């Protein structure tokens, strides 16, 4: 029997089988091919979706908006000041209202419980555009990019996450690698390792799919022979300078450098979910340089701008993979 995701919400990848994830990736490739060939694919004409954003975004918002319009749907965007959710109206009641008006709901915010409450009460598919715990839509874009660079043969390849390996991206990468048979390495200081509950959930999945999960504090050991080296920002915006001071001190040894990339497999690629602090050409980058004397944070500019860097392919793939998720769950 073929994969059927119609009516399903997309909350975290632990909810999906290997076959279902592979189906979404294949569908993403098909949509990318159609987009590039200029083939119309307004398969969801007449449907409408709403995007609920507690956190700002470039890639997630644009991917849902362009992807939705490519599929023929109407798209409504609500920022924190445009809805009553969580203020004058509970999340449960917001879900019940929006579920009467829209065919699908995207949520990007803080608490995982919020997106789960939406999904439990909306009566329509709900898609997790990011929470503090998980970033599942990012994962499909990441893996599609890996597939494209390794001839769609990714089983047995090794992905290394460098830096704050307890964050939502690293947690999600551990899950998707385990589901798809890729070896996952978390490399960072001991206090920045993934939570035990995530490791415990992923270990049996990794065994089933013939891959490994490794935790190490040694960057050279982690990167030697790796096929994908991935990193993310060290601190969330808005946190006090004291947090920046501490994080820069503890995570600087885990900056992705040309020296570390040279230890990786000759075919290795660099990934980052963006935005990245690789220079001083942003207000925040300049501010960090002024306060802390650091001109590059989680990745050297030379790596970010190198041929090994596939970050903009990865960013484009957000649109194609999100389109696949919407189509598969709404068709």
Located regions from the model:
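Rossmann-like adenosine-cofactor binding region
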Residues: 204-301
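C-terminal helix-to-coil terminal segments
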Residues: 284-331
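Phosphate/diphosphate ligand-binding glycine-rich loop within oxidoreductases
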Residues: 36, 42-147, 278
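Glycine-rich phosphate/diphosphate-binding loop of Rossmann-like nucleotide-binding domains
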Residues: 54-66, 151-232, 237-239
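Positively charged, low-complexity intrinsically disordered leader regions
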Residues: 1-62, 66
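Structural alpha-helical scaffold elements that stabilize or flank donor/cofactor-binding regions
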Residues: 98, 118, 221-222, 303
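Short, conserved loop/helix-junction motifs that constitute active-site signature segments
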Residues: 154, 178, 259-267, 306
């Amino acid at each position: 029997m073929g994969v059927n995701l119609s009516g399903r919400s997309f909350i975290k990848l632990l909810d999906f089988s290997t076959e279902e994830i592979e189906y979404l990736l294949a569908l993403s490739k098909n949509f990318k091919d159609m987009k590039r060939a200029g083939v119309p694919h307004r398969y969801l004409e007449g449907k409408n979706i709403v995007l609920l954003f507690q956190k700002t975004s470039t890639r997630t918002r644009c991917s849902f908006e362009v992807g939705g319009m490519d599929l023929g749907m109407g798209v409504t965007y609500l920022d924190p000041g445009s809805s009553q959710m969580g203020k004058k109206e509970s999340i449960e009641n917001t879900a019940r209202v929006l579920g009467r008006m829209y065919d699908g709901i995207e949520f990007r915010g803080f608490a995982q419980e919020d997106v789960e409450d939406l999904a439990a009460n909306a009566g329509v598919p709900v898609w997790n555009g990011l929470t503090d715990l998980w970033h599942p839509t990012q994962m499909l874009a990441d893996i599609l990019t890996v597939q494209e660079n390794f001839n769609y043969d990714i089983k047995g390849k090794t992905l290394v996450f460098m830096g704050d390996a307890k964050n939502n991206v690293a947690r999600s990468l551990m899950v998707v690698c385990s589901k798809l048979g890729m070896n996952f390495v978390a490399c960072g200081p001991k206090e920045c390792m993934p939570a035990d509950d995530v490791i415990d959930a992923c270990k049996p999945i990794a065994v089933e799919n013939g891959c490994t999960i490794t935790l190490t504090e040694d960057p050279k050991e982690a990167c030697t022979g790796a096929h994908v080296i991935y990193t993310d920002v060290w601190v969330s915006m808005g946190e006090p300078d004291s947090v920046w001071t501490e994080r820069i001190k503890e995570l600087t040894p885990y900056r992705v450098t040309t020296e570390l990339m040279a230890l990786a497999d000759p075919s290795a690629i660099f990934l980052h979910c963006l935005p990245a602090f690789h220079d001083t050409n942003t207000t925040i980058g300049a501010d960090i340089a002024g306060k802390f004397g650091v001109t590059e944070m989680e990745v050297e500019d030379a790596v970010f701008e190198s041929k090994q860097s596939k970050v903009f392919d990865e960013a484009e793939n957000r649109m194609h993979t999100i389109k696949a998720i919407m189509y598969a769950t709404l068709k």
